């Protein structure tokens, strides 16, 4: 298959490196790795690059220094890489220079995929940080918000206090929000953090 029909997308986040292989414009396969272990990502992605040819590599990274360590062993990879940034894209107007590439990618995707039949689109991205990004159907950036993600909120409560336990998002699977009030510490933290996030999203 021609190189132009293949593209490898790499999203380097604060916690995870998420990758997707697009064939003919459709997502074909996905992989993810720990950002703390870029060597593993480099080894696997190099094998994918060799297997699937020299197609475009699109990269969004919010962690400076990780991308060079991933592609340092890729032969001729640099000339195929498109690094997403506010200045490298042409779809969205009004983006500010320091805007994270993850939010730039969200804005571009929202505009391309979700504004054909709508006046505007909002992307809410729950990661290490929770971000909100909005664009209209003319490709104008409408603004957004950034706050602490749920995992980091749990960690902040634990490490900033003497007695509150550290919880994880995995423990939220069976959380009931039938009432905002809780009668034990763990449930009080869970409901407080989750309802706080829900409230933020609804307010925005």
Q: How would you describe each model-predicted region?
A:
Residues 117-124, 142, 163-173:
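Short, structured loop/turn "capping" segments at alpha-beta junctions
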Residues 1-89:
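N-terminal glycine/serine-rich phosphate-binding loop of ATP-dependent small-molecule kinases
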């Amino acid at each position: 298959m021609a190189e132009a029909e293949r593209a490898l997308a790499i999203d380097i986040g604060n916690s995870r490196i998420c990758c997707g292989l697009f064939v003919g414009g459709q997502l074909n396969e996905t992989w993810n790795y720990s950002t703390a272990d870029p060597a593993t990502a480099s080894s696997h992605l190099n094998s994918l690059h060799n297997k699937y040819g020299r197609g475009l590599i699109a990269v969004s990274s919010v962690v400076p220094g990780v991308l060079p360590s991933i592609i340092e062993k890729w032969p001729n990879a640099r000339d195929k890489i498109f690094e997403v940034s506010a200045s490298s894209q042409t779809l969205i107007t009004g983006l500010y220079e320091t805007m994270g590439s993850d939010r730039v990618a969200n804005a571009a995707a929202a505009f391309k995929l979700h504004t054909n039949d709508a006046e505007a689109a909002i992307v809410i991205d729950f990661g290490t940080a929770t971000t909100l990004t909005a664009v209209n159907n003319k490709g104008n950036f409408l603004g957004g918000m950034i706050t602490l993600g749920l995992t980091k909120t749990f960690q902040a409560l634990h490490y900033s206090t003497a007695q509150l336990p550290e919880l994880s998002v995995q423990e939220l699977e069976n959380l009931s929000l039938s009432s905002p009030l809780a009668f034990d510490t763990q449930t009080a933290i869970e409901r407080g953090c989750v309802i706080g996030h829900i409230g933020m999203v609804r307010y925005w």
